[in-house]
Swiss-Prot record:
The gene is thiP. NCBIfam families: PRK09433.1-3 (NF006952), thiP (TIGR01253). It is found in: Cell inner membrane. Coiled coil: none annotated. It comes from Haemophilus influenzae (strain ATCC 51907 / DSM 11121 / KW20 / Rd). CDD domains: TM_PBP2 (cd06261). This is Thiamine transport system permease protein ThiP.
Amino acid sequence: MFSLFHHPQLRPRHYAGGVVVISFIILFYGGALSSIFALGGELQWRAWFTDDYLQHLILFSFGQALLSTVLSIFFGLLLARALFYKPFLGKKWLLKLMSLTFVLPALVVIFGLIGIYGSSGWLAWLANLFGMSWQGHIYGLSGILIAHLFFNIPLAAQLFLQSLQSIPYQQRQLAAQLNLQGWQFVKLVEWPVFRQQCLPTFSLIFMLCFTSFTVVLTLGGGPQYTTLETAIYQAILFEFDLPKAALFAMLQFVFCLILFSLTSRFSLSNQNGLSNSNIWFEKPKSAVKIFHILVLLVFVFFLFSPVLNILISALSSSNLLTVWHNSQLWRALGYSLSIAPLSALLALTMAIALLLLSRRLEWLHYQKISQFIINAGMVILAIPILVLAMGLFLLLQDRDFSNIDLFIIVVFCNALSAMPFVLRILSAPFHNNMRYYENLCNSLGIVGWQRFYLIEWKTLRAPLRYAFALGLALSLGDFTAIALFGNQEFTSLPHLLYQQLGNYRNQDAAVTAGILLLLCGILFAFIHTYRDADDLSK
């Protein structure tokens, strides 16, 4: 392997940045995980594995993830078919707005869901209006499921919609000629493409739900509805039982590593390789049309009512003006607007360094090493950020932290958390540029910044801006790292919102949630502007 560095077409400018990033990842994760395993090695393992509480944690962690995933896929399938077969005004905008769930902070969504499904929410108010005694119950398993469905139904629907669009129109025309309708049509024409997409979609959503932290922490409502991830947080912050936290972190690491391996194996892709600009389908029957309309109406209410509730609550808050005199809000806003761009820039820089090395190795026909480089950047998907943060907490617990130290730790954690998504966005453009322009640049002697500015910038400009904006949005709403390291003097908007919700300061929480929603809405518009520009440039 070391002979690679003597290859005539592999210069230090190609690998220096990538080697530095990989070394940093190894040291960062190695130090954090070694502190966890060192403390976990002192435990009496047999006693713990017969512990009823631990067994309940593992069972509930997998159980809630399984239930959330099955429901997300089921409703996602229904929504995908309704979106595909029912033409309506504003469909393009609805499809874009479905992506809003990806950039909305979990705590903002939770605030909106409480306002709809809580004991004093919209649905309870409507029930009382019609003389019903129904009371909403958002805490516990029901609340966890509702929040997971909010985030994952749009994701599943978009993936299954791509599958429906990939069916050749000739197959649909042939099915119409053979009079295949109803379940026969679904079974013979649609199910084969759904089946290809089901396993990768299932593994992705299951992993997202299994590693869900903020949703379970806020809506769990008690020890009965606790997962391994939230148990780590509680063991550190509430009990200060570090050996117990280390055990939970080790188990979470092992489970996530297995899930990450499975998710990587069943990677999301259009497996039939077909893409159709000509979409044809036979018009559904009236009963099916009505069903599709009902599905769309229910989904629109489910998706937009929490967002609308946040806006109304923020604008009608009695503290809308006075809250701006609160120094805590300005401190949280200042830290959030400092952490987010630095984390996004760091994620972008590390991703570019890895991609420059990866694409050069692929060009030199070292495909396995090239893929290893990319997987190194995706490692955060296998090691949850809370496990990493807990390892750093153990490693540095004897140090007297200043706010600057905490700031740097959170920036690095958020950057590593965003890097897999940045890598996914930039991987194809960077590798395509290598394939298309490498020989041309070599023949003309164009290298370094000159190559980047004259040759690559045109195709990379839109995806780079898109990746930066997405990293910014993800870091802005990230709560995991700062949940462990935050305090009254070092806080962020999500951290402040969590404290306000915990102290039942709903009027203040409404304004904080509104600010976060506004910031994420601006970033969402920015993301889609450059995403559309990227699509046009292809």
